[in-house]
Amino acid sequence: MAIIDADNMMKLPPRATQASGYDVLTHAVEAYVSTFATEYTNGMCRDATKMVFDYLPRAYRSAFRDAKPDPTAREKMANASAIAGIAFANAFLGINHSLSHKLGGWFHIPHGTANALLFPFVCRFNAQRHPYKMGTFSQYKYPQAFERYVELGELIGVKGKTDEQTFENWIKACQQLKKDIDI
């Protein structure tokens, strides 16, 4: 069980805010592109993703000692965390989290920061246009990560003229988010 209380997050320091915030994004996105995603989890993933893009930079800026508090951004990030947690508990996570646990543990990198460093590479790997169906989970459909990333790009407002452009814009937006929070 997790207790997510925005009041406890109001004074979270900048590095913890950036790392935990990008971890929330990774939870939501990995659950959304999962072959185990369902109609139940999809909406949660989309909502959490949108909230992270809308509120993580604000929450991060409010984390500095001399900054004006932003309780709305903190509360929205707490909600995004809870929503993404419910989604990934049902749809599961992917290789980004698997790799970041090892990378973070070995090099003493905060978990969310490790997720952020790997995220664009994992998105590109997962977005192969001709994925193969895994025999291990033969009852599940083919991976459709590329289409899912395109949907998320459209959701956050970075649509291109083609799906490929939208995907590239999605990657750029995720990279920009990292810059906005100094990762």
Show where each model-derived region lies.
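Glycine-rich phosphate/pyrophosphate-binding beta-alpha loops
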Residues: 82-115
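Short beta-alpha connecting loops at secondary-structure transitions
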Residues: 10, 101-105, 133-137
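Gly/Pro-rich interdomain helix-loop hinge
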Residues: 109, 113-183
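Charged/polar positions within long, soluble alpha-helices
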Residues: 57, 86-89, 93, 124, ...
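Carboxylate- and glycine-rich phosphate/diphosphate-binding segment that chelates Mg2+/Mn2+
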Residues: 1-91
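Amphipathic alpha-helical interaction segments
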Residues: 43-47, 51, 76-79, 98-101, ...
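Short alpha-helical scaffolding segments that buttress acidic/His motifs in well-ordered protein cores
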Residues: 25-29, 77-85, 99, 119, ...
